Amino acid sequence: MTAVPLDLDALERELGSDPEFVLHSRYLTASIRVVIGEAQSFRIVIRDGAIAEIDPVVTPFDSYDIQLAGSEEQWSALLAATPPPFYQDFYPAMLHHGFRIEGDMETIMAYYPAIRRLGDLFRSVAVSEVPA
């Protein structure tokens, strides 16, 4: 099972218009690198709670404050419409399945509600791309 690549334009629209994400990310300034196995990697840049850009080209040399990384299989489980046990959220996936949440732990813990909502929005974008 492989992860569905995320539509970054749709993701940017979702992030900018989702009231829960906007509320939880207020005052956040961070670069979030997302690594979906070998299939896709991108960086979300947030400045003062607003999406500044989503960079679709990320290298191992690019800096980040937070990294969400896992294999394609882990991401497939996380992005499923009904995720299997312990894949409903990044933190239990890290504890039980080896998913990685890395970077500035103080920022991660302070803004975890925004990071968790990010996962929900990733799921909504991925589910909309699955062919019927």
For the regions a language model picked out, list residue spans one by one.
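Feature captures hydrophobic
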Residues: 1-132
